[in-house]
A protein has these predicted regions:
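A short beta-turn/strand-edge loop motif at beta-sheet boundaries
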Residues: 39-44, 92
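Membrane-proximal alpha-helical anchors
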Residues: 1-40, 50-52
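Serine/threonine-enriched low-complexity regions used as flexible
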Residues: 93-106
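Intrinsically disordered, low-complexity Pro/Gly/Ser/Thr-rich segments with frequent PxxP/GP/PP motifs
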Residues: 55-90
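Acidic, serine/threonine- and proline-rich intrinsically disordered appendage/tail regions
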Residues: 18-22, 33, 107-136
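Hydrophobic beta-strand positions in extracellular immunoglobulin-like domains
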Residues: 34-36, 85, 104
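Surface-exposed coil/turn segments at beta-strand junctions on protein surfaces, enriched
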Residues: 25, 74, 93-95
């Protein structure tokens, strides 16, 4: 057990920014989330997708400034934007296989690039119940 704790503490000391892009399904809505999973801030974060992604009203979500440049993304911070309702997204027969290329820099200016592949098809058949609006 002591060995695992040593490895974990060494990993956190050596941590560098780790930025991901994820698609989130919640109560019938699809969101795109940009998250810094690490204990270190990320700088000059940009995301490019391998194709256009159309959201509400057919707008190209990829064109949002959010994906072009986030000057500073704090440790453990997530920025989320609404993509569309799952019903609308899938009824337009939008692509379900999407690749996101994430570029960011650490404090010293070292550039890191990663690609994450997503398949939104996993969300097509998920059931959900619309909750009525509640007031406290």
């Amino acid at each position: 057990m002591a060995g695992k704790q040593t490895i974990k503490s060494q990993a956190s000391k050596l941590s560098e920014p780790d930025v991901i892009v994820d698609f989130v399904f919640d109560d019938g809505l699809l969101f795109i989330a940009i998250s810094n999973l690490s204990d270190k801030p990320a700088y000059k974060v940009s995301i490019t997708f391998d194709q256009e992604i159309h959201g509400l009203d057919g707008k190209d979500i990829c064109a949002l400034p959010l994906f072009r440049n986030i000057e500073f993304l704090a440790p453990h911070k997530t920025i989320t934007t609404l993509l569309d309702s799952s019903g609308s997204y899938f009824s337009r027969e939008e692509s379900t296989r999407i690749s996101a290329c994430i570029t960011h820099h650490d404090f010293q200016g070292t550039k890191k690039v990663a690609t994450i592949n997503h398949d939104l098809e996993i969300y097509r058949e998920i059931g959900f119940v619309r909750r009525p609006n509640t007031q406290d």
